[in-house]
Curated annotation (Swiss-Prot):
Location(s), subcellular: Membrane
Catalytic activity, as annotated: [Wnt protein]-L-serine + (9Z)-hexadecenoyl-CoA = [Wnt protein]-O-(9Z)-hexadecenoyl-L-serine + CoA
UniProt record similarity statement: Belongs to the membrane-bound acyltransferase family. Porcupine subfamily.
Protein name in UniProt: Protein-serine O-palmitoleoyltransferase porcupine
DNA repair as UniProt keyword: no
Gene Ontology biological process: lipid modification; protein lipidation; protein palmitoleylation; segment polarity determination; Wnt protein secretion; Wnt signaling pathway
Organism: Caenorhabditis briggsae
Bilayer topology term: Multi-pass membrane protein
Active site as annotated: H323
Alphabetical keyword list: Acyltransferase, Developmental protein, Membrane, Segmentation polarity protein, Transferase, Transmembrane, Transmembrane helix, Wnt signaling pathway
First-level EC class: transferase
Record gene name: mom-1
A Gene Ontology molecular function term of the record: palmitoleoyltransferase activity
Amino acid sequence: MDHHLDPNLDNLFEMYGESVEECATQVANGTLLTLLQMLVLVWMFFLVWRLSLPPRIQTFLHIAMTTLTVAWFSPKKLESVMIFHTFSLISLFCAVQKLNGYRILGLNIMLLIALQNICSRANADDYFLTLRGVLMMHIMRLSTASFAIVDSNVRSISFDQLTLYLEYIYFPPFIIFGPYVTFDQFVKMREKKWTRFEEQLGVFVQGSVLIFIGITLAIISSCYVDFFEPGSQFVEDALTAMSFRCSHYFICLSTQAFAMFLGSKIVVANPVNIEFSRSTLQTVSEWNRPFHTYLHENIFKRRFFQSTALNVLLTFAVSALLHARDYQMWLTLLALGFIAYSETVFRKRIADRFSMCVAAKPCSVRANRRICKHKHASFSKRVLIINLFFMILSMYHLVFTGMTFTDDYAAIGYPFSHTWTIWGTHYYSSFIVSFAFLALSKII
């Protein structure tokens, strides 16, 4: 769960003007200007791929434009470029030496935390937060390339292979906002052949609609939520959480449009599936699908432990550490992992014990038909009621985990006590429910 993917995002989402209309106008102008700058890069490299330039020139162009992009969007341009390339050089050197991909990932996380400590000592916490999202995405790409190089089982990497990895790592349109794409997805996107004008026009229209919806959600996050007068503390907490989610949706929909313009069909996030999710497990997986794919493929599926619970905990721990030393993000992600795990275990137990289609994930679909062997299928009244209960509970968990992202410490980072204090106003209810689910799963 992170929306700090743009160095200027916090500035974009500041409330402007004295009225909702003034605020909406200025936020729309600010977000549109930033997106237009990124769209220039998108269309530039869309054309570069069509020119079929020599590999050396194309790789040089990727690296040069990435350097300029990092400098353009960063407050301290020279320092940011040096830091960005330091991560790259260390990781690529280790990858070429066939160092284990997990060691490279761990090394990058340690470098990220070390950088945060240096910035903290220099009273530059705000600068680190502007750069953190860029570096987090960069680390994910570097570690993905490292895994691919190590798994290739070749003694030495050819120049053509190396240039392709470098193009993947240094792809300017995805440097600031993202999204994360796997190496295979990048290759498919790069090699896509556009055969019809109607196809390109359809993609342009769909992407434009996504950007329009994203900007609308950014306006809701920055203006309408702040101007609304809550009638109770719970409503205020719900609005705070909704503001956080709307800013996240703005990023996700915008980056999905970028990828779509370049020929990729990846889905970054579907707000409807998050707001009305079947379970907390679905909320977690739908929150940022590419990020979930990265963690699922590179951490969870490797099964470092025999226990599923420990593998879930490790996955969320790595997710938290990718945000550096951010206590609020650590607590939020680990809390989501615990909540999702306990609910999944409990619902599986109910589904097995009473033969009801109420598991955290719905039964599988084959040939457009749902394969359900439960006595009480998904449209049974009792099943509908139980699934509705868990959907409402997932909505509450979104409020519980999102209400801590207030504006108080957004620019410098949240202290450890902040999260616990706000959760305490709800009597740690999500945790109590989760512990109850674990206990009941043993009793039933």
